[in-house]
């Protein structure tokens, strides 16, 4: 861990009540610039939310998962789900709030379509989706005067296109499952924060006060996987924003604690069945769709 790394600055929810979506304005936008190591404390609200960064990288943590979000990705957060946001790199955080009619989740047009939107999910962000989102009026409700009729009409047209684009956005399996058991939760959050700090479960166990055998059992019972497989998902998720910064493969491997690019490449092949160049290029290509 880098001793010169600044401490995380915790702040409260970023005035979501000033951007409340309604039937008249079903899709609201909020745009904020946040410094690295800022953490928005856990909170929830009664509407749906899409969190994305037009620049920089954020991490969204919910009860059952953690999601690293570079500009090519977004995270859907259903109504009422508690979540926290950590800024990994200086970011322009764009938040979309969705009014949710009773029985509907996300941009679904029917209760049947809502099934896939009842849980947090990572989505691809096309250039069209991002461009539409950036065109929405991101002004708060107060103390500003009510928007004009022309503004509302334009907002409704943009919202219709945005909701359609969200329905078309492909889900991406880059979320990191999180356990509920307290000891394992602490370990998992520490790994996500600094995945290259230790390579083995035994080394991480020394930091938690639980034995490696106990943690192995907890990984299986809580997450249905092994520590090695779970940590690989963390490393893959961390690799995506590094690739978005155009870092060479050797630098990405070193950042993630691998002794050589070939060792990193072997891990990627085992995990996703493709070489890292193809896996990471796909992540960048989706951003330009």
Segments from the language model and where they lie:
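Short acidic-glycine-tyrosine-enriched beta hairpin
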Residues: 64-79
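Generic protein-terminus/edge-of-domain signal
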Residues: 1-58
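Terminal helix-turn-helix DNA-binding modules in bacterial transcription factors
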Residues: 198, 202, 221-261, 281-289
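Alpha-helical residues within the helix-turn-helix
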Residues: 206, 217, 221, 254-255, ...
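Short, Lys/Arg-enriched, Trp-marked, Pro/Gly-tolerant hinge/linker segments that flank
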Residues: 118-119, 143-211, 221-233
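Ligand-binding loop in jelly-roll beta-barrel domains
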Residues: 66, 80-104, 108
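Short hydrophobic/aromatic patch on the recognition helix
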Residues: 72, 215, 219, 263-264, ...
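…primarily DNA-binding HTH/wHTH and HhH modules…
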Residues: 1-12, 244-245, 266-289
């Amino acid at each position: 861990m880098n001793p010169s790394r600044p401490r995380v600055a915790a702040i409260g929810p970023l005035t979501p009540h000033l951007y409340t979506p309604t039937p008249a304005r079903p899709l609201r936008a909020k745009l904020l610039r946040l410094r690295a190591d800022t953490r928005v404390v856990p909170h929830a609200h009664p509407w749906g939310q899409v969190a994305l960064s037009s620049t920089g990288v954020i991490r969204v943590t919910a009860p059952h998962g953690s999601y690293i979000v570079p500009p090519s990705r977004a995270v859907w957060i259903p109504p009422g789900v508690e979540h926290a946001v950590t800024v990994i790199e200086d970011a322009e955080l764009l938040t979309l709030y969705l009014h949710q009619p009773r029985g509907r989740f996300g941009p679904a047009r029917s209760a049947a379509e809502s099934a896939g939107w009842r849980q947090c999910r990572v989505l691809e962000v096309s250039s069209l989706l991002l461009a539409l989102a950036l065109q929405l009026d991101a002004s708060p409700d107060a103390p500003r005067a009510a928007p004009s009729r022309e503004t509302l009409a334009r907002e409704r047209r943009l919202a219709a296109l945005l909701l359609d684009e969200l329905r078309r956005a492909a889900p991406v399996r880059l979320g990191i499952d999180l356990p509920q058991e307290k000891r394992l939760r602490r370990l998992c959050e520490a790994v996500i924060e600094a995945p290259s700090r230790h390579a083995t479960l035994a080394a991480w166990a020394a930091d938690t006060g639980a034995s490696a055998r106990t943690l192995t059992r907890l990984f299986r019972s809580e997450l249905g996987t092994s520590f090695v497989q779970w940590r690989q998902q963390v490393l893959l998720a961390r690799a995506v924003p590094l690739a978005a910064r155009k870092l060479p493969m050797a630098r990405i491997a070193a950042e993630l604690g691998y002794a050589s690019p070939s060792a990193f490449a072997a891990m990627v092949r085992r995990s996703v069945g493709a070489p890292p160049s193809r896996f990471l290029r796909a992540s960048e290509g989706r951003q330009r769709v």
